[in-house]
From Swiss-Prot:
Signal sequence region: 1-28
UniProt KW keywords: Signal
Domain of life: Bacteria
Compositional bias annotation for Polar residues: 39-48
Biased composition (Basic and acidic residues): 49-59
Stretches the record annotates as Disordered: 38-61
Protein name: UPF0482 protein KPK_2871
Length: 113
């Protein structure tokens, strides 16, 4: 029994040693360090295409921004006009919400309060 236990320990030690030798021999020699900056031809081409697409959509973005700014200006002017119409001393002036104008009650014409 004691003999078989020694054989098992010996066999286990030999297997462990051979596994260490086998794995150490399978590693590649790493005496060089290669550092890539990520600046490859493919990444430059992709960046160029993204820049081109951004430039192509620039005029569209500017149009959308101008339209939004015009709508905001129109709303702002209408709000000020409504406020002025309601504060007017002219009792015949009233605010027409559909046309966003200050009108005279008697004539229906636009007035400047």
């Amino acid at each position: 029994m004691n003999m078989t236990l020694n054989k098992r320990w010996c066999l286990t030690a030999i297997l462990a040693l051979s596994a260490v030798v086998y794995t150490s021999s399978s590693f590649a020699a790493t005496d060089r360090l290669v550092i890539e900056s990520g600046d490859s031809a493919q990444s430059r081409q992709q960046a160029s295409m993204e820049k081109e697409q951004w430039n192509d959509t620039r005029s569209l973005r500017q149009k959308v921004n101008k339209r939004a700014e015009k709508e905001w200006d129109k709303t702002d002017v209408a709000f000020d006009a409504q406020d002025n119409c309601q504060k007017s001393a002219n009792v015949n002036a009233y605010w027409e919400p559909n046309t966003l104008r200050c009108l005279d009650r008697r004539t229906g014409r636009a007035i400047n309060p």
